[in-house]
Amino acid sequence: MLGNFRFDDMVEKLSRRVAGQTSRRSVIGKLGTAMLGIGLVPLLPVDRRGRVSRANAADAPAGTDPRAKWVPQDNDIQACDYWRHCSIDGNICDCSGGSLTNCPPGTKLATASWVASCYNPTDGQSYLIAYRDCCGYNVSGRCPCLNTEGELPVYRPEFANDIIWCFGAEDDAMTYHCTISPIVGKAS
């Protein structure tokens, strides 16, 4: 009990000293500065080089860019190196009963999307792909891909593939299942 009184006395002396040496305006000013600083934190750039390096560590030779190994193909749509999957981060819906443009039965399409420009090696053109999440069931676990071509940091959410976009799906289907990759048009 005696220790509590010493602690109380110490806190009281400290608070009285702070109150005697500072004004309300300075406290409010410092509080406002801190709140502004906290609000600006999401605008700071995000470095993802370590994440890309870990994802490609087994395949990339030492001293090379891990993304340099990305060679798109136009044959197997369930493979991660299929040209439309250049910026997908999740599971390909074609492996779960869906297709490149349709969600599997029973899942709901999220209203929001993120976009990327992917190169088609067959016709030599780049296309704008609007990745959209299918929601409502647990993650399928089939055909997981982590491709980061053209991905931008999280503070540009329309180009970030790390966000689960299921918040806009109908019936409050908030559980991520897989991602579709329809073509929006040619990229110029």
From Swiss-Prot:
| A Gene Ontology molecular function term of the record | methylamine dehydrogenase (amicyanin) activity
Q: What is its EC number?
A: 1.4.9.1
Q: Where is this cross-link: Tryptophan tryptophylquinone (Trp-Trp)?
A: 114-165
Positions bearing Tryptophylquinone = 114
Q: Which keywords does this chain's UniProt record carry?
A: Disulfide bond, Electron transport, Oxidoreductase, Periplasm, Signal, Transport, TTQ
**Annotated S-S bridges:** 80-145, 86-118, 93-178, 95-143, 103-134, 135-166
Known InterPro entries for this protein?
Answer: Amine_DH_Ltc (IPR016008), MADH/AADH_L_sf (IPR036560), MADH/AADH_Ltc_C_dom (IPR013504), MeN_DH_Ltc (IPR004229)
Q: Note how many cofactor molecules are bound and how.
A: Uses a protein-derived tryptophan tryptophylquinone (TTQ) cofactor.
Q: How does it assemble?
A: Heterotetramer of two light and two heavy chains.
Q: What does this protein do?
A: Methylamine dehydrogenase carries out the oxidation of methylamine. Electrons are passed from methylamine dehydrogenase to amicyanin.
What is the name of the protein in this document?
Methylamine dehydrogenase light chain
Q: Which gene encodes it?
A: mauA
